[in-house]
Every structure is written in C-alpha cells, then in structure tokens.
C-alpha cells in the first residue's frame, strides 16, 4: 500500500471507531431492497442508462433518462435519504466547533466545485466551453502528452445541458442497485453475489481493496469478475459496476466492523455526530485539502453527513435531495447568553420561560414515540423544585429523552455538583427553559415510571399535577445501583457531555468512600436497568428530542 493510502486508511479506521455508536447492521435491509429492485426494475432501462453514461457527450435527453430511472429506484427502495435542512447552534456544539465546521465546509465547497468544473478528477476546466475542452484534449494529444486519466478517446466527457443543477445528487452508487445489477445482468444468484461482496468487505476492514485484490478474489468468487476495471470518475451513475461501488456494497454485508457506510443519520442525533467527527478530526489531525482530486475520508464523511440530516448518507437513494452539503447545513454562531430569571417561591415550581409553538410540537412528537406500556426508567439531578437534568429511558426500544435546565439556586447547585452530578453552571446557561416542565406535563397517560428512590420523582410529578402517574421504586443499595457503573460509562458515555466537573466522594462513618464518578440521569437509568437485568445491553439508545431543541432559540443564521 502506498504511504498516502496508509494514512488515508488510518483516518478511515479512526472515523469508524469514533462513529461506532451510529453504525448499524444493514445486511438484511440492503438485501430486501435488492430483491425489490430485482422484482420490479426494468433492467432494459438500466442497460440504456449504463450505455449513455459511456458516451463522451451527454445531453438533456440523457439526463432525463437518468433522473427518471433514479426516481423509479427511489420509489422501490426503503433505504433512502430525504431532504432535511440542518441547523447547528451554539449549545449542541461550541462556537469554536461551529466555526471549524463552517471553515471546513467552505474549503470543501471550493474543492468540489473546482473538481466538478472538469470532466475528470484533478483536471481543471475553468469556464471553458465544450469546444474549447475538446480542442485542449486534441492539442495535448498531438503534443504527445499522456491521455487524461485513462480516457481512451482523449476527449473530456461532459454534460451538454441547459440546467447543470439537475445533475446534483443524481450520481453515486447504492449497494442494493449494485447487487441487483450483478445478479440480473451477470446471471448470478443473489447468494453468490452476497458471498463475493462479503469477502470484499472483509478485506476492506484492513485495507482499501485494489484491482489486484479484486482479480485474486474473482478466482474464488466469479461474480466479482463483472466489476469494471475502469477508474471511477465524477458524474458517472451508480448503475456502473465500479470497484468503489462493490466495496461499498461489501461493507454492508458484514453486519460488523463499524463501517462508515452503514451510518444512519436522524435529526435527533445530527449535532452529536458532527461533534464526534470533529473530535476524531482533531485527534488524528485530519484536514480538508483544497487541492483537486478525490476526497479524503474526512472530506467524504463530512460532505455526506451535511448533505442531509435524515437517512442513509452513504448507501441510500439520495436522488430526491436538493442542494449540496453547504446548502443544506446552516450554522448559527449567535450566543445570546442567559436571561434573568425571577425568584422561585418556597415550595413552588419554578416559573420557566414559554416554549415556542414549533418546539412544543417537536416535543409532543417525540413523546408520542414513548410506549406507555413499556418499562420506563426516570431519573433527575438536582432537587424536585429545581431540577437541572431529566432522563426518561425505555430499555426495550432504546428510546430516551434527556434534557437539562439552568438552576435557580446556584449555591445548592454547586454543592450538588461537587458531590454528585459534576455539572458546571456555564454549561447550562444556554439550555431551553420550560423543557422539563412541558415534558412532565405531557407524559403519556397511563405510563408507569420506574425509579431508584421515588421520593424526588413523586414530588416532581405532584408539582406538575401528574398524580395519575404511578411509580415503581426498585430500592437498590448504593453498591447494587452502581454495579455496572464503569461498563455503562465506557459504552454510553458519549451520550452525555455535561458532567465535566470534579466529583468528591462523600465519606460516611463505617462505610467505604462513595464513587467519584459523576451522576448522569441518563446513564444512571441505564445502570439501574442493567442491575435489574443482570447485564449491560449492547442496544444503542435512540434520542427522541433533537439536540438543538435543548437550547434557546437563536436569531442570526449564517448560511454556508
């Protein structure tokens, strides 16, 4: 492997580790979509599109055929990416992180647009006309220069169309399409295709497969012989059986390896994912290179995640998504600070700011996904009349609600931070007021809450007139409750980043010192549940409320 490939693959491995919480077993889903395509797709039309993509010049008529076929594929597939504008604000990400993201997207925009100005990667076309590009190729050929990027004709392949924006998101391979074409057009069984691509995917866990690797594997798996030997080019449809398309499909056949190709993005987790990407970038010293050429792993991941915040950025159909990554991701760099809160009367619930109608609708939509008949854990940090953190967790589905609140009693908060939750006041000043109260008031009727110690939860429910909700107190000892503390923090610590302070162990006479680990309401719920069940479940929890909803509305938006 060349040294640059070694560095590139090291980045890929680092990103796989850093985003492992968002990778998924997708083999069965991809095969389901493949079978749907095999049953309903007209492969005569597929062959026509494959042929037109080999033409040196493509017209509006050719583009219409490609877009029509893409629409049909999109309608047949379950795995797709949908249009979703992403807004990242101070709170979910720090201002420095937002500025870093904005800068990287700007650099990526320049790189992508420069590369797409030519017919091939790394060949700059500027604003030359089709005729000028052809003349340039002829001059270079007559002067004895090597042919451009393996193009046998020496002519730059271009789209001669009226509206170039119609090209956006019409390309890129999809594993289901790749597998369907290999099966139908290659006359292979789907099982043989799955086996061959699985072998290619296993190789991809340790290196980037190349053409030499492909030839060796094809001896054992003949279906891989249909993969084209041509180098991938931009603006070439996903119906072509390129090596990169086959590798992507192979990654999906593993159900393991934390492959980036299996990432699914949801609006509720978008900010957390971007934060994780930036952390890996910093640790590995990754960067966006403005030099023309193929995207490096960081650039590729950043573009795909920011293109749409809802769906399968690597492997799903995205032909119905409009715009580019820098069009669909908006960064808000405004930090309004904390408004003054009125004092709280003794024994009364805090008077919290009103939520916007839009936020209330989002919260209600998330609460609808709670199963009122399922086991539901609840925990808070802070006091019932001044809570600073709330978590509600349903282990069967993995769904959870997790939010914070700025305290009114700062002195009490600092004492609790020192000996319990370890949260810092500065990290809560931008949290959305009124969120905890609205959630408690709108919990599903008939829901039964399970808690470790019910007194505080009962008081919290009474303050919000929810005496209709029953509570089960599991009454674990301190040792029992924290039996799986380290395992839970190791596995799920990424779900919460507010507990940064130093926690001191309380000393009780006749007892060993308590834990110095901070108490997180969400992770405590998972710990208590693990103690009752006897093990820590590997299921990845799913956030029901968008991360940005946890923070105050901001005003000034900067579009990238």
From Swiss-Prot:
Residue ranges of the region described as Disordered: 333-353
Pfam families: Arena_ncap_C, Arena_nucleocap
Keywords, comma-separated and alphabetical: Capsid protein, Helical capsid protein, Host cytoplasm, Host-virus interaction, Hydrolase, Inhibition of host IKBKE by virus, Inhibition of host innate immune response by virus, Inhibition of host RLR pathway by virus, Interferon antiviral system evasion, Manganese, Metal-binding, Ribonucleoprotein, RNA-binding, Viral immunoevasion, Viral nucleoprotein, Virion, Zinc
E.C. code: 3.1.13.-
Chain positions recorded as Mn(2+) binding sites: 379, 381, 524
Disulfide bond positions: none
A Gene Ontology cellular-component term: viral nucleocapsid
Compartment(s) where it occurs, according to its Swiss-Prot or TrEMBL record: Virion; Host cytoplasm
Site (Important for exonuclease activity): 456
Main location, first listed in the record: virion
GO biological process, one term: symbiont-mediated suppression of host cytoplasmic pattern recognition receptor signaling pathway via inhibition of IKBKE activity
Region of interest (Binding site for the cap structure m7GTP), ranges: 53-236
Taxonomic superkingdom: Viruses
Protein name: Nucleoprotein
Lineage start: Viruses, Riboviria, Orthornavirae, Negarnaviricota, Polyploviricotina
Gene: N
